[in-house]
Amino acid sequence: MLERRQFLEMAALAALAQAGPLSAADEFDAPGSDAARQALALKQGRVTSAALVETALARLERVNDRLNACRFLYADAARAQAAAKRTGPVAGLPTFTKDLAEEKGRAFTEGARAFATRTGATDDGAAAAIAASGLISLGRSTTPEFGLLPTTEPLLGGPTRNPWNPAHSSGGSSGGAGALVAAGVVPFAHASDGGGSIRIPASCNGLVGLKPSRGRMAGEEGDKGVTAVGVNGCVSRSVRDTAAWLAALESRKGPYPPVGLVTGPSRRSLRVGLRGAGHAGEPHSDVRAVFESATDLLKRLGHRPVEAPMPYDAPAAIDAFLNIWGAGAARSVQGVQAWLKRAPGSDDLEPSTFAFAERGAKLGEAQLGKAVATLEGAVSAYLAQFDSFDVLMTPVLGAPPPEIGWLAPTLDFDTLLERVLAYVAYTPIENAAGAPAIALPLGMSAKGLPIGIQFTAPPGGERRLLELAYAIERARPWHGLRPDVWAA
């Protein structure tokens, strides 16, 4: 027998199927509008891909001066793609690609002034997967330099601003994607995550952000080990849009069976581990309040929350992660030097990049090996905790989105690092573990800024997370919320 909600959803879809043509703007602004609705309208012939692209371009023009979320636009190429026949569940829908992914012939700055004029030589795995899905990328969304910081305030182009309050950060490193989706320019956008960079902008902008398992997505099948921290995904305004992106772009040759399209919640009662404190201690009081509210919601949904103590030496694990992060920054600086054919200076790279790179460059082979071993031990303990519960729940961040400048790359590095560690107090371990994690917008700060809660499962457990996310979304819907900067 159909549940009442399922019956109403089916009735709504049937009514939609019988409706006459709508303007493309309706597919962006109507209640509940998202990528899934746009895809249905395309399939039914009630709207064209060209109309969706033109509408998204117009919406970008309305808000980008206030948000600074897209610096490179490829409108003519998008129009040409929209005119071509494209097949697939997300084909023909507009999106943006983060400026850390390499797209052939398009700007490839990685947020660095040194690469201000560089263009991509080829499509990397993420860009190739986006193209193969039939999605139409309108342009490049902003990112901090090399994706190193949890805010998008590069000296190349200036800060990207939060649609809920433009004086505040949109997060990072997928801050441009987060701002564009939250402001209603497109329903979902490419994002990537090496330490929280999908989940952080999702939390800052009131969005859904799924970090997939290591090796899950097309082009990432060979990634292995705790140092392979980066994955690709999206930020979106609805769970079903995130599920659709995953189904369309996941690998069929990865280490886990394909998830496929997850369409709704499970009836299963889950054991949920609760960890409110991060490696830096207790979060901001507004974050703690949202966390407690989410705990109550889980109980009402029939789940079984249990306290989950920290199973590993968090300070040692974070220090090891920072050493590996620094080694990556050092490689980025070496790449800049090869590109410039000279040593980069202060006009090329930001102070924080040099500082991270200096930390990495100082590591000898033995020290780096010790960092890897420390992180492997932490990951082993982290994964073992899932013997005691099905899902782990934490905040996404230690505080609400800060004001622009609080995490600026020009700050004294000791001050910046102290602030970063207090802010990014929950998300890096999932990258080292290769575990999937989803951020959901479950509350607001006293100042009206979004606060996200994170749910994590063992590697390969995306279906479990999406089913739980559907149930939470139905119980506490966020679709009607609109930020101060909205593209209509």
Annotate each language-model stretch with its function.
Residues M1-A14:
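N-terminal secretory signal peptides and thylakoid transit peptides that target proteins
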Residues A11, L16, D26-G194, S293-D296, ...:
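Gly/Ser-rich catalytic/binding loops embedded in alpha/beta enzyme cores
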Residues A24-F28, V208-T295, Y312, R476-A488:
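A short helix-breaking turn/cap at a secondary-structure junction
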Residues A51-E54, A83, S285-M310, V333-P344, ...:
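Acyltransferase
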Residues A56, T242, V272, L298, ...:
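Residue-level signal for inorganic ion chemistry
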Residues V90-R113, S266-R275, I324-L383, P395-A399, ...:
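Short helix-loop capping/hinge segments that flank enzyme active sites or metal/cofactor-binding pockets
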Residues T122-L246, N431-G443, K447-G452:
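Short glycine/serine-rich loop segments
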Residues P402-Y423:
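Short, surface-exposed loop/helix-turn segments at secondary-structure junctions
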